[in-house]
């Protein structure tokens, strides 16, 4: 019994010791495990709530929460944060020792840390669905002008709202919820169209499957106007019109002719291929009630054109012999400014010519300077150009194309609350788009932004598309983008991207990222088709000197007006060889039209009885180089159908007067009298799924039975030759003697 009792007592003592030890250890752990913040950042929408979490809380302490900006975010005593309005705030969290709990060495109060809060979006009650009732109500109270001289979007006095979620009856492509922009949303003016949710336009990729590079778009009223680059072609700087950002038609040209100089007239071996009019900028000024187009002509100078009527008016020209590469025009107050070379600014004014109908003068006001360094933001750009300039809300925005050394293009944006008097430190930089599309893998860049009458915003950029050229596309814009995956917020930046299958905005910021869906645009679909190419039977019964051909036509360089006609043989386009040219590059009066992808056909018919020995006439595919199907007249005056291409097809080969066409194939049939010869080129362009970029040539002597002739011609894009996408030309030129001519009966596209 005594032994047993001793064992029991000993066991109890050991157990007590273990309990004491464990209790002591637990106290040490508790002492070491201090409370800390689990929540470091919070993203919350207006009207929504989120809680701040604290690790290792104990009953000995209470916790206080203080907001640095209660107008943005409020916080309760329990740590619940409520978004009040879009913006940023900081919540300071403190730990306070409760009364009666103080021990020696313990602090009564300490700061646990700070929680960064970002509030985005708007309260649900502020989300407005544009219905016929609300549109009509707004229209009844509005006093905004509806003519093409209405106030441009960037300065319209409006109130921020958000557009609607898709209606149940809408097509499969989701209609996104468009977030706020830094500029207030417009009130619909009387007469503006109601938004029909069942008839919205959809932008696929590419937006226009044709060569429309360096585009600039503005909105005036409910109409959109676009200008682009056409290099050596005239009339130059085409003006296109749309009401839905998808369907476009050519309505005018800013530049009727280049100056009367050898390099613009293809005289004395000079030419301006890959040069001419570059990267035009288009603006409308509400104060002057004028439209302005500015652009640089390489090897010549800088031009500004103005007109009160962009669709039907004539243009007044102003000039200065200087170079403003890739200029962007912006008006600020009464000042007129040109942004060029990406980041340089020059104030200018316009001086009228003393001669009636003369060219006015562009005057530099003071010196030019760089607004900031292109390394701003830590970027290391190689290519960096093509600025577009805007004043929206509190900020001035510049949007520029950039690449790091590879060919992949990106769109970067810069902003400041000052412009002409800004310092470099006033500017910020942000990459706003880096990606491609499901249709093609090259980067999309160089462009700007435009809004709608309903307050939504869209980006317009272009993409290198090999032989087809540089093609434009429309992207979604989000001014209030929250990247929840990476915990990043981009307030007041025009982030570009697309909407996924659930209607969520997706920004592309990586070379492997792609726009995956067509874009439903919050505009009523136009009932018009694109008119950037078209047929012509050359019937101009009322044509008189100074009149123009159909808007789809442009000449290669300045035409020689004495040697073309649509009236000498009515119903035909006649090209006379006023001089010996030697090759297609120097042939005067060649008429050109764009091609359209992915498949396209050009067809014509030509009468050749009046050709002279050494003459070539027909239909040509002009790409990085040229291929042609047509009629040749040999040294004996006999005429045959042939197919050929230029002799120098090396990459980077420039147009030279010495170049001669190489005949790949000649038909056996001799052409008698004025028998018509029918010519056709069938194009196939690269897509994301097929590699083509080729042209095949055909001819017919009766217009019904077609024969293939010659070799398949490889298309391409070369900055050293034409710097343009593939075009079809109607051409006639002499290699031995002048005086011959041909008549083209029609031109058809399919």
Please give the residue ranges for each predicted region.
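Ser/Thr/Gly/Pro-rich low-complexity, disordered linker/stalk segments of secreted
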Residues: 123-187
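C-terminal segment of classical bacterial N-terminal signal peptides
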Residues: 18-28
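Carbohydrate-active catalytic/glycan-binding domains of CAZyme proteins
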Residues: 176-178, 182-750
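Bacterial N-terminal signal peptides that target proteins for export
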Residues: 1-12
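Extracytoplasmic soluble-region selector
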Residues: 26-142
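Cysteine-rich, disulfide-stabilized extracellular repeat modules
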Residues: 13, 40, 50, 61, ...
């Amino acid at each position: 019994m005594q032994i047993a009792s001793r064992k029991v007592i000993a066991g109890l003592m050991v157990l007590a010791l273990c309990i004491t030890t464990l209790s002591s250890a637990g106290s040490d752990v508790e002492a070491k495990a201090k409370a800390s913040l689990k929540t470091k950042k919070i993203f919350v929408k207006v009207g929504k709530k989120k809680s701040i979490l604290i690790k290792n809380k104990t009953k000995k302490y209470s916790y206080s929460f203080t907001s640095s900006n209660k107008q943005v975010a409020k916080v309760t005593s329990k740590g619940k944060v409520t978004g009040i309005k879009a913006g940023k705030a900081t919540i300071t969290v403190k730990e306070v020792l409760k009364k009666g709990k103080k021990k020696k060495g313990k602090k009564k109060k300490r700061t646990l840390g700070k929680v960064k809060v970002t509030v985005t979006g708007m309260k649900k009650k502020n989300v407005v669905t544009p219905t016929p009732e609300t549109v009509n109500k707004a229209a009844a109270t509005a006093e905004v002008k509806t003519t093409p001289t209405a106030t441009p979007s960037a300065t319209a006095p409006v109130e921020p709202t958000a557009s609607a979620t898709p209606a149940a009856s809408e097509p499969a492509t989701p209609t996104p919820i468009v977030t706020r922009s830094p500029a207030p949303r417009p009130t619909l003016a009387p007469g503006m169209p109601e938004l029909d949710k069942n008839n919205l336009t959809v932008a696929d990729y590419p937006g226009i499957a044709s060569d429309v590079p360096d585009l600039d778009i503005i909105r005036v009223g409910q109409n959109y106007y676009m200008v682009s680059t056409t290099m050596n072609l005239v009339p130059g700087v085409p003006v296109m019109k749309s009401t839905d950002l998808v369907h476009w038609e050519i309505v005018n040209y800013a530049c009727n002719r280049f100056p009367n100089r050898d390099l613009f007239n293809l005289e004395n071996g000079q030419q301006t291929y890959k040069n001419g009019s570059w990267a035009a900028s288009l603006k409308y000024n509400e104060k002057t009630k004028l439209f302005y187009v500015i652009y640089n002509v390489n090897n010549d100078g800088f031009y500004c054109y103005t007109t009160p009527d962009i669709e039907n008016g004539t243009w007044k020209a102003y000039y200065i012999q200087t170079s403003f590469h890739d200029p962007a025009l912006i008006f600020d107050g009464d000042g007129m400014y040109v942004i060029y070379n990406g980041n340089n600014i020059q104030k200018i004014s316009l001086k009228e010519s003393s001669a009636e109908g003369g060219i006015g003068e562009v005057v530099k006001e003071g010196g030019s300077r760089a607004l900031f360094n292109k390394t701003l933001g830590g970027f290391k750009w190689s290519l960096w150009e093509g600025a577009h300039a805007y004043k929206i809300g509190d900020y001035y925005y510049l949007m520029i194309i950039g690449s790091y050394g590879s060919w992949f293009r990106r769109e970067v944006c810069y902003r400041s609350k000052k412009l002409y008097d800004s310092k470099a430190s006033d500017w910020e930089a942000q990459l706003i788009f880096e990606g491609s599309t499901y249709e093609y893998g090259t980067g999309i860049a160089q462009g700007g932004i435009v809004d709608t009458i309903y307050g939504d915003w869209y980006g317009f950029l272009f993409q290198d598309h090999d032989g087809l050229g540089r093609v434009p596309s429309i992207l979604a814009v989000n001014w209030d983008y929250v990247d929840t995956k990476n915990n990043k917020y981009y307030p007041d930046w025009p982030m570009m991207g697309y909407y996924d299958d659930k209607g969520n905005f997706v920004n592309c910021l990586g070379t492997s990222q792609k726009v995956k869906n067509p874009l439903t645009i919050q505009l009523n679909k136009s009932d018009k088709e694109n008119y950037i190419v078209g047929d012509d039977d050359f019937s101009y019964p009322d044509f008189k000197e100074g009149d123009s051909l159909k808007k789809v036509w442009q000449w290669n360089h300045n035409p020689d007006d004495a040697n073309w006609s649509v009236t000498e043989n009515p119903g035909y386009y006649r090209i006379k060889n006023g001089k010996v040219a030697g090759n297609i590059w120097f042939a005067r009066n060649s008429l050109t039209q764009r091609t359209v992808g992915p498949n396209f056909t050009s067809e014509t018919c030509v009468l050749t009885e009046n050709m002279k020995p050494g003459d070539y006439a027909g239909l040509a595919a002009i790409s990085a180089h040229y291929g042609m199907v047509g009629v040749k007249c040999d040294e004996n005056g006999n005429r045959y159908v042939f197919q050929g291409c230029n002799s120098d097809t090396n990459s980077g080969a420039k147009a030279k007067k010495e170049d001669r066409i190489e005949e790949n194939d000649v038909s056996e049939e001799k052409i008698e009298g004025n028998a018509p010869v029918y010519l056709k080129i069938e194009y196939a362009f690269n897509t994301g799924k097929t590699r083509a970029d080729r042209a095949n040539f055909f001819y017919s002597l009766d217009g019904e039975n077609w024969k293939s002739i010659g070799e398949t011609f490889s298309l391409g894009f070369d900055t050293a030759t034409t710097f343009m996408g593939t075009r079809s030309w109607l051409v006639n030129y002499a290699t031995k003697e002048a005086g011959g001519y041909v008549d083209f009966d029609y031109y058809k596209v399919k």
